[in-house]
């Protein structure tokens, strides 16, 4: 059944291929006096997952659900409102299928700091207690008020940061993946550098990516303004805001690098190229100070 649970199939395809006959026979050998864990980190409402939970319940297995406040696929920061909708939906299914509770994992290869994961863990507490209660939007506003003394609008910078994180993941990558959860894939390759003998070619090659850079640069400025407002208005948990601030600088670094590489590729003579190289050097050197401040804040 594994392939039915982890492939993008239609409901009709799932129903057509669903077959538990081997499991129905093997269940006779399953131990009874234990708790079985049902790990599912993404959307728990997919039909295959719901059918499996019903199979557990039908066969009288003691099952505990396990969702995630952070996974290895999202370095430095969870995404999608701290995964609150996934958590809420799984908690509701736990109630409907009479499972023996639910926990939320938080993988440290996904986020280097507890503060970036905490909102997801609070969502787990919220929805495991009352899955039919607040909507995710209502939860996000309540979290802002109770954890920081801020309005939902004053915490909108965090939604923008989660969006920025997606570009950060692949900003400098053209194929494969580099991920702390499972290492570097064999197909991993970074983008090429501009060729001074072929000005403009690099820009044409990566035009789509550079268009996104301009969007992300504007997003960075928006996040900075939002963080400044939050820092001025917050009544508590200011350290969490410090963590967000440094994480925002990290997410912005590849944007700055791509911007100066585009400048270099657009130069028309040696003097302009030398000036562009100085700017590239400044950005590269700034990584050390950015990293030092990042590590100081995180530690």
Annotated model-derived regions:
Residues 1-299:
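Substrate-binding groove of N-acetylhexosamine-processing glycoside hydrolases
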